[in-house]
Amino acid sequence: MSGMSRSLFGLGLRKPHYGDFLDGDAPVAVDFVEVISENFMVPGGRPRDVLRRVRERHPVALHGVSMSVGSADGIDRDYLARLRLLADEVDPLFVSDHLCWTRIEGFNAHDLLPLPYTEEALDVVCANIAIAQDVLGRAMLIENPSSYVAFDAPMTEWEFLDAMCARTGCGLLLDVNNIYVSASNHGFDAQAYLAGIPADRVAQIHLAGHSQGRTLLIDTHDRPVPPPVWALYEAAIAKLGPVATMIERDDDIPPLAELIDELQVARDMANAHMRRAA
């Protein structure tokens, strides 16, 4: 990945902000936007027109929620064909999806369900990623999930991700909030997670907020990035160096100016690290 893309700071493009990105001057403080792939995979219509017009002003990353790389019954090739058409049109910075399964025997749960970190699951995931990358004609990024249940398995999540990257050549989308949420829910050390991932495979970072459930933290994307997640982000960029970073907000979405202010915090942290490293 180029040094230029490593220094980018972006936001998720959501419907309440379409006007901000389409009318008047483009927000110069936003280097790129990320969209949910499935919302734009139908040719024609307003969503595709909005994406085309936004793409004229900003680079775009495609982030999926339905590829289901963990499905043991294989990957949906029709889905991949439609995603390939979208990617060819958009020429995205990144194409990404999650380490999870969402579909079985044609039924889609529309949720990011956890995997056991076993050799059998690794075989399934790697085979599906290989097919996806072949159809898409590019390496993709896989995001670490937030999780609320853990299996008795021989590998940690970071060991699984390391092996997955080594076998498939895919990159990582490191969701720092997901690390924090899962570490809290399952009692592992978030710093050990950062130490265990293959640093050279991390191409993008997600930041978001979470909510406190009755007994677990929930990855809700409905509030600002909290201080402990900022602290973990600072630790991540200290290990990784500058990485393209974006902030996710999917509920209780504030005015764009508030998200740009939050994005500036990430930019300032990264710039401070670069000055210290110089």
Swiss-Prot record:
Pfam families: MbnB_TglH_ChrH. It comes from the Bacteria. Coiled coil: none annotated. SUPFAM superfamilies: Xylose isomerase-like. InterPro entries: MbnB/TglH/ChrH, Xyl_isomerase-like_sf. NCBIfam families: PRK05409.1. Belongs to the UPF0276 family. This is UPF0276 protein Swit_4400. It comes from Rhizorhabdus wittichii (strain DSM 6014 / CCUG 31198 / JCM 15750 / NBRC 105917 / EY 4224 / RW1). The lineage of its organism: Bacteria, Pseudomonadati, Pseudomonadota, Alphaproteobacteria, Sphingomonadales.
